[in-house]
Structures are given as structure tokens and as C-alpha cells.
């Protein structure tokens, strides 16, 4: 009786492991990755009253200078 129980649990563990490995193999490795940083802060010489910020209106990189009066 004990042997059947051990065999059943072993089969369950093997199936679970195979399922996990299969799911990882099918997953896209770049799916959870953030966009790579394609800019350098030196490329955005902000004025004295501006800060480097991230916003959709700045174009494809979404990075640019924001005036301090626009920040809450």
C-alpha cells in the first residue's frame, strides 16, 4: 500500500516538473523585459529650472526635460 502511495506522489512530481519546464520553454524570454535604455542623460541638457523626466509626449524614448512648475 505504501509503495503505491509513493509511486503516485512521484508521478505527480514528475508531471508537475515537466509541465513547469515546458511552460518555461514556451515563454518568450523578452516578455517581461523592460525597454532597453537608448538614451544618455548628457543628451538632454536641461535648463537650471528643469529636470529630466519620463512622459509619453516626449516621443519614442519618452524622455525629456520638464520644467519644475509643471511638477506637482
UniProtKB/Swiss-Prot annotation:
Source superkingdom: Viruses
Cited InterPro entries: Gp79
Protein name in UniProt: Gene 79 protein
Source species: Mycobacterium phage L5
Amino acid at each position: 500500500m505504501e509503495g503505491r502511495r509513493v509511486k503516485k506522489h512521484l508521478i505527480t512530481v514528475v508531471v508537475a516538473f515537466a509541465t513547469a519546464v515546458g511552460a518555461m520553454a514556451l515563454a518568450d524570454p523578452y516578455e517581461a523585459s523592460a525597454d532597453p535604455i537608448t538614451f544618455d542623460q548628457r543628451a538632454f541638457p536641461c535648463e537650471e529650472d528643469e529636470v529630466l523626466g519620463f512622459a509619453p509626449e516626449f516621443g519614442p524614448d519618452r524622455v525629456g526635460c520638464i520644467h519644475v512648475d509643471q511638477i506637482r
